[in-house]
Amino acid sequence: MKKIRLALQKSGRLHDESLQILNNCGIEIQKGQNQLKVSSSNFPLEVFFLRNSDIPGYLLDNVVDIAVIGENLLHEKGEGIVVNEHLGFSKCRVSLAVPNQSNIENVSELQSKSIATSYPNTLKKFLKKHQIKAKIHVINGSVEIAPNIGLANAVCDIVSSGSTLFNNNLKEIKTILKSEAVLCSSPSIDEQRAELLNQLLFRIRGVLSAKKFKYLLMNAPADKVDRITGLLPGMKSPTVMPLADKSWVSIHTVIETDEFWNVIDLLKENGAQGILICPIDKMFV
C-alpha cells in the first residue's frame, strides 16, 4: 500500500505545532534526533523534515504529496499548490516597515525608494497592484538591519509579535499579507494518496472543530426548559434529560466557547444551576 508523503519544517515552532496536531489526530510519529524521514506506526504516512524554503519546490515536483507550511511561503513560492485546510497556528504577517524617524507614513511614499526583503515575489505583486516603482534588495536574513546600514529606505518582512521591528527602531506602515499554517497538497497527487489525504483531513477537521466548542451541561427547572434552550446558540437541539426530582431536568449541548460568556448570566437568571463546561477532544459534524 502506498504511503502519503508529508513535508514538515525541519525545526522551529511550525515543526513542533505540526507534530502536535498529528498527535492530536491519533497519528503516532516517533522521531529520533537528526532523523530527516520517519514513518507513522499506525497510519500510512511518511514524514520528511526539510528546510522550510525548499518545501514548495518539493510539492510542485511531486517529491512529496502534502505539506504544512505558512501562507507567507506559499504566496512567495507556491503558485499552483493546493490549499486544503487552514490550521489556525503559526500566525504572522508580511509587513512593510520603515525607521521610526522616517517621514514615510504610507505606501504611496515608497515611490522610487529602496526596499529590502526576503519576499521579493510577494513585494513585487503588492507594488505592481499599487502602481509603485521601487528598487528591491533581496536579503535572505536579518532584513531589519538594512535601513540602519543605509541599504534601504524600508523593509518588507515577516512579523510575528513585532519585537524584532521594535528592537531595530522600525515601525510598520502596511500589512501586505496575513499568514497562518496551512495543510496543502501537490497539484499532481495521485488518486490513492488523495484518498489518504481525505482521511487525514477528516481527522484534522475533527481536532480543529473541537477547539472552537465546549460541551455544556446544566441542571434547570423543568418549567424553564423552553426559555433556557432558547438562549443557547448551540448545535441543533439541546438534549434534555429527566432527573430523579421530576421538577428538574439536565440540559446538554455543544456551544462555541465565546458564545457561552454572552449567555451565562441569562442562564443563571432563568434558574440554571450546576453549570459545567467540558473540553471536547474531537468533534465531527
Locate each region found by the language model.
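Pocket-flanking alpha-helical
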Residues: 53-58, 63-79
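Small-molecule-sensing regulatory modules
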Residues: 2-45, 71-82, 87-93, 101-285
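Active-site-flanking structural segment that lines cofactor/substrate pockets
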Residues: 39-57
